[in-house]
Amino acid sequence: MFFKIFVENTVILPNPLILTKIEGLLMIEYLLKNREQIIKKMEKINDINRKEVEEKWILDNFENPKDMGFAGGDGSCNKLDYISFSFYGVGAVSFIHGRGEKVKKAKEEYIFDITHPLDIEDRIRRYMLTLELKTALYVLKNYNIDYYIFDGSLFSLLIFTKKGIEMYERELEEIYNEYGKEFNKKIDEETKSGEIGIISKDLNLELNKKILVEHVEYILTLTKLINEFKDRIIGISKTSKINIYFDKNMPDIAIFTKYTDKSGYSEPIDFVNKLGDEKKEKHKQLSSVVKGINFIKNKPFYAKIDTAYIQFVRLEDNCGVVGLTSFNKIDKEVLSSLKEISINGYPYILKKSHETVEITTKKLEAIAKLLNIDDPIARHILGKKKKKF
């Protein structure tokens, strides 16, 4: 009763601080109503058989490294929304690290431009991924390395091939027939010379067609990387939603992290061949990966993918578990060699790539100032409206 009187007596007060306080109290009231339900859900999620986890975790100190060279890279994208257009920045960077050698930068590329705000999130992400893929191709072609490491899952690259274009597969094939030969030639030239960019970005096309043309360039670049270097690329992720090892309402990476602490790995699973269609369909993420694989394996792209592996690894005791994705099994010598170039169980070149390439909003705003962009920013307009109330 006191709470109701308190609310009724203070709602009429105009002081915004009091109104904010009331909103907070109301949130707490709703939270308390759901407290027991949330606790029960957490208890159910954490109902894990520790013995089952330990049986699937193979202990290993990774003490048999080979003399290997690794390169790794990351990308970044960000945007500022103005009322007339979006100003965006995308970038990709790669570093090389051999055992006992200093880290050196192999490639760094950025694009800053303005564009129509329609589908801007997906478009700049596509630009970023295309730059990352071309950077990987350039480094693999021009440097003496054994493996190229992506910051993140390789499977996300496959999922993105189908993102938002399910209804346009016929149009994509037509665009491939129109631009495929030219794009393939230019991608080869770019990744040989190092003059990397987005070929389709500046084509004078109607916007909807242009988006599809940009997507074809992305798929062609990914297919080229897979067909030429699939045995030498690895994805390393700090997070993962996959739960095929335990089939619980908790990601496998979380289970291995919470219920093991020693260095080791899980047996890699080739889910393309070892999991039945019913189980693949049950796991939405795996189903999306398989759909992406089937899409680019067929006409007109013809990516050569026969296997796709997922496993989890902890390179050092009491460090984080990471997810490894690859198109072939990664042997223990490679894992031992990865440990040699890692800090706290994570490859240093990936950490350095992320820190180098990150395009923060603050950085983008500083670049916009250099360009003297004076168009009003959309959120500033919203802010002015709020002040009138």
Swiss-Prot record:
One of its GO terms (biological process) is DNA repair. Its EC number is 3.1.-.-. GO terms for molecular function: metal ion binding; nuclease activity. Pfam families: NurA. Its cofactor is Mn(2+). InterPro entries: NurA_domain. Mn(2+) binds at D74, D151. Keywords: DNA damage, DNA repair, DNA-binding, Endonuclease, Exonuclease, Hydrolase, Manganese, Metal-binding, Nuclease. Belongs to the NurA family. Involved in DNA double-strand break (DSB) repair. Probably acts with HerA to stimulate resection of the 5' strand and produce the long 3' single-strand that is required for RadA loading. This is Probable DNA double-strand break repair nuclease NurA.
